[in-house]
């Protein structure tokens, strides 16, 4: 057993170390929380609303997940930009879940897309057709219109040049255009604004996509998409 004076010294040193370490741990925890909770880096971290700004909802797959934080940054002090805390996947999945994503909140503008999952058939037992895709989109738009928000459809970004890494198939430009034409007709029928992201990048896929087997975008590609989305949202809000 340690002598009394050494035990006292040990306890004092222990308390001093704790008093030094504890604030550091608190600061580290706060810094980590703040980093994780940054809406400009985390797409699923929706901002605390400024009541003086319009509310915007972005609905879409991983392409929109990639550009959402950048859109928030570009529209900072202009709009409260939200999105569902999930990948919104394909059109039939969207039709089933759209009410949950809209929620009970008031939206001034909803910018939405479904497409790539329908083209490639990821996680789907039944292969989509332009007709089934259009039918699902029509159902989605009818539900969105009930919010009385302005609606903007993002025309689906292009397929990758080679066999997609998961589906192992090539989606031709002809197939992509069939689906996009079907979507555009639905939007025309309902008077929905259209943001043509397809034309923005189709001729520069080698530059902006991650690879010939990947539909996703490099940082430069995400910045390009985000700028067009932010500009488009700003224009529609000002109409």
Language-model region placement:
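Bacterial Sec-dependent signal peptides at the C-terminal "C-region" and cleavage site
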Residues: 18, 27-40
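Serine-esterase "nucleophile elbow" of acetyl-processing enzymes
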Residues: 34-106, 110
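Extracellular interaction modules
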Residues: 21
């Amino acid at each position: 057993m340690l002598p009394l004076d050494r035990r006292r010294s040990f306890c004092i040193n222990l308390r001093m170390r704790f008093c030094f370490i504890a604030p550091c741990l608190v600061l580290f925890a706060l810094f980590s929380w703040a980093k994780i909770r940054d809406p400009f880096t985390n797409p699923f971290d929706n901002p605390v609303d400024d009541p003086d700004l319009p509310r915007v909802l972005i609905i879409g797959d991983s392409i929109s997940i990639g550009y959402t934080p950048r859109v928030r940054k570009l529209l900072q002090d202009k709009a409260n930009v939200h999105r569902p805390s999930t990948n919104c996947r394909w059109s039939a999945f969207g039709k089933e879940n759209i009410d949950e994503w809209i929620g009970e909140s008031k939206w001034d503008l909803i910018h939405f897309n479904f497409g790539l999952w329908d083209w490639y058939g990821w996680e789907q037992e039944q292969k989509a057709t332009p007709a089934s895709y259009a039918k699902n989109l029509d159902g989605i738009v009818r539900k969105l219109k009930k919010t009385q928000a302005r609606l903007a459809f993002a025309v689906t970004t292009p397929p990758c040049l080679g066999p997609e890494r998961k589906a192992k198939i090539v989606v031709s430009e002809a197939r992509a255009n069939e689906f996009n034409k079907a979507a555009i007709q639905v939007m025309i029928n309902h008077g929905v604004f259209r943001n043509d992201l397809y034309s923005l990048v189709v001729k520069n896929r080698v530059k902006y996509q991650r690879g010939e087997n990947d539909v996703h975008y490099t940082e430069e590609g995400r910045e390009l998409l985000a700028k067009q989305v932010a500009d488009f949202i700003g224009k529609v809000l000002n109409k």
